[in-house]
Amino acid sequence: QIGVWKALREAGMKIKGVAGTSVGALNGALICMDDLGKAEEIWGNMTYSTVFNVDDSMIGKLKKFGVRSMKVTDAAAEFRRLFSDRGLDIAPLKKLLEETVDEERIRRSPRDFCAASFSVTDRKEEDFDVKAAPPGTMKDIMMASAYFPGFKQEKLGGKTYLDGGSVNNVPVDLLTDRGYKDIIVIRLYGIGVDRRRFMDIPEDVTVHEIAPRRNLGGILEFDSARTRKNMKLGYFDGLRFLYGLCGRKYYLDMPYSEAYYFGRIMSELDMFKEWLRPYVKEHEFAKLTGYRVYTEKIFPFLARKLRLQPEWDYRDLYGAVLEVFAKKMQMEVYEVYTPDDIVGKIHELFSDRLTIG
């Protein structure tokens, strides 16, 4: 979410309102405060002990080697400590919210800010207009929205709450109910209910979705290496959304028509022959002449091998082949490439092979 926000912010996109649940509520507060630096600092240095009262070194051993890496007595003592008093001690998370959430900055923000939670006391979803909250209660709202099962239960404002994602992990309705017409949803694919499946989005409302194509890790995986990687992924997924970048794994700047890329394919057939080499016997290569054999046989074959959608076009095919070569050449994923960038690398590779030969 923070990575996407960075991309939107750099592009000058005006954000008028934010709705979040669970971790999205904390990120929503940072967006309302317009404090990208603080957001990157928090997530870039995130550890388990930032959220729970735990020993990071012990968690590291558990992740790397499993429970067997610990003495039985040490493991038993740690689990008793973690889950004593009916749940995980989240005092560090409360401290983080206390140090981060600036109520006055949020109230002065021109952006609307809503959060969702589930009231166990009332047995129903409870939505909050955060900026209208009584003084001193914003941090409690953040906690109420993020009260994950397993956390030590404490009453907030006389009520017991559960993570809002359990009933509404994509709170689009909080914005449509306030008249918003152009909405960007940043998906994390956490547990819970996507309420959009059960709501009728008004016809005059446009919902754009930015969703990761890679695993973001576990829902309670608070590891700085993981969160930095996820921020980078979010940033480039934001660029994909903003500028219509192509690619499944890579980020390709391919803004021209299908006809343009068909022309490039036909002028770069040697590159396609190289891709085909594992699938075509050497003596068959001599028969790969003329355009019809490519358009009628070779290209459909490639599309199947690359698992393109049935409605693929030559822009899709060209981009998919470029991605195969980019992966083979171990090119950095988190960069924006033009076809010329990748084709240039391919030519360098072929040239080196010829020189060596």
Predicted regions and their residues:
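Patatin-like phospholipase
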Residues: 1-21, 29-357
